[in-house]
């Protein structure tokens, strides 16, 4: 008995209306390289003006500035990712003279070099020549709040196709919003509404994944592999760009010691980075795809197996087990591959996880470990145990 198919294939119901359709809309004029000069303005100013116009029931003006603010947010996000991606390999600082134990100097030397690179990069990009938005405004965009206002403004402007798309885009982030669900029920009662249900923030890897699963369910193994092998690196690219965008500007509110201040900033960055995987996970048929990266490897290993390509199937199986070591189905698949290794000419290298899987697993695991440590040991002083005497402090440290 050969390897078994991923059960996810039975759960992902890919109807025509559920398939992510690339949403253009407000991004038709968007270009990272040549953003329209007439639209360059501070993101927060554009967003606040849009909401003011919304409150005044000036629907056309509100729509215009909400759409501009969405493009400005994407420009800022893409600009952050561009600079951090290009400066991630900044030339390391030369080793200082003295003992090799000066690791701290080398560390901060690298930090200074990277800061220099980022400063130069940002000086050349228009997104950073504007005043930067507050954290609360950025949070609104991450949670797709502008679409809540857009759908009603579109509706009042009698642009039902865009209202339907905006409502759907918002609901994907807020599936329990009762008012928006009622709005969507009304929209769905209209003739032809299904044609306009699309995610305006969909990513290319989502469409590729849906196509791959459809081909898989139709037993078109080569097509499924082709699309899934495109979806995987496309998702990872978006993931690492999301991590980079988390390293943007920060509001400094507290006056703290040097290391505590650095730790506070880094924990805030970690909070953002840990959310990246969840934020980027596709929502299909109203449900997020669980363990998205692992699921792609599950589909790949079975499709490769169906083509008798065990040299590619085995690494996908091992990659999947990085993320779910207790999965009995995949364990059995791996036993099958091991048993037939001589027949298929498999060597030890075919039973190693793929490099991109290892990198993704290591990054996400280490980020979670660091964040958990910070949550446990770097809480506010008023939440932790107060130690009054030095002897008590030393005893506490020794027991730890």
UniProtKB/Swiss-Prot annotation:
Keywords, comma-separated and alphabetical: Extracellular matrix, Glycoprotein, Hydroxylation, Secreted, Signal
Subcellular location: Secreted, Extracellular space, Extracellular matrix
Reported disease: Defects in Crtap are a cause of osteochondrodysplasia characterized by severe osteoporosis and decreased osteoid production.
Classification via Pfam families: TPR_leprecan
Protein family (similarity comment): Belongs to the leprecan family.
Residues bearing attached sugar chains per UniProt: 86, 362
Record GO biological process: chaperone-mediated protein folding; negative regulation of post-translational protein modification; protein stabilization; spermatogenesis
Summary of the function given for this chain in its UniProt record: Necessary for efficient 3-hydroxylation of fibrillar collagen prolyl residues.
Predominant location category: secreted
Protein name as annotated: Cartilage-associated protein
Provenance organism: Mus musculus (Mouse)
GO annotations of cellular component type: endoplasmic reticulum; extracellular space; protein-containing complex
Summary of the tissues where the protein is detected: Found in articular chondrocytes. Expressed in a variety of tissues.
Signal peptide (residue range): 1-25
């Amino acid at each position: 008995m050969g390897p078994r198919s991923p059960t996810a294939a039975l759960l992902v119901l890919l109807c025509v209306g559920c398939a992510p359709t690339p949403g253009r809309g407000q991004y038709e004029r968007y270009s990272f390289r040549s953003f329209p000069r007439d639209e360059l303005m501070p993101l927060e100013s554009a967003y606040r003006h849009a909401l003011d116009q919304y409150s005044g029931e000036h629907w056309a003006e509100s729509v215009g500035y909400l759409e501009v603010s969405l493009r400005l947010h994407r420009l800022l996000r893409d600009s952050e990712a561009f600079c951090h991606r290009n400066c991630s390999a900044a030339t390391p600082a030369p080793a200082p003279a003295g003992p090799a134990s000066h690791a701290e100097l080398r560390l901060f030397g690298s930090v200074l070099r990277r800061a220099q690179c980022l400063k130069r990069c940002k000086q050349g990009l228009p997104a950073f020549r504007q005043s930067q938005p507050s954290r609360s405004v950025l949070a609104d965009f991450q949670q797709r709040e502008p679409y809540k206002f857009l759908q009603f403004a579109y509706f009042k402007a009698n642009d039902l196709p865009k209202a339907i798309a905006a409502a759907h885009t918002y609901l994907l982030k807020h599936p329990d919003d009762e008012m928006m669900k009622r709005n969507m029920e009304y929209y769905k009662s209209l003739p032809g509404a299904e044609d306009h249900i699309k995610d305006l923030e969909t990513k290319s890897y989502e469409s590729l994944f849906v196509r791959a699963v459809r081909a898989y369910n139709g037993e078109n193994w080569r097509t499924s592999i082709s699309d899934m092998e495109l979806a995987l690196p496309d998702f990872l690219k978006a993931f690492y760009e999301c991590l980079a965008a988390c390293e943007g500007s920060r509001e400094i509110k507290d006056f703290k010691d040097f290391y505590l201040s650095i730790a506070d900033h880094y924990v805030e960055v970690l909070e953002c980075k840990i959310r990246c995987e969840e934020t980027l996970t596709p929502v299909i048929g109203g449900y997020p795809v669980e363990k998205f990266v692992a699921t792609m490897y599950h589909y790949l290993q079975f499709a490769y197996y169906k083509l008798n390509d065990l040299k590619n199937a085995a690494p996908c199986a091992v990659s999947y087990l990085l993320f779910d070591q207790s999965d009995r189905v995949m364990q059995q698949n791996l036993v099958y591959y091991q048993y037939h290794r001589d027949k298929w000419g498999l060597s030890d290298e075919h039973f190693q996880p793929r490099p991109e899987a290892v990198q993704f697993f290591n990054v996400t695991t280490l980020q979670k470990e660091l964040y958990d440590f910070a949550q446990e040991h770097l809480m506010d002083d008023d939440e932790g145990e107060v130690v009054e005497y030095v002897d008590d402090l030393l005893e506490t440290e020794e027991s730890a």
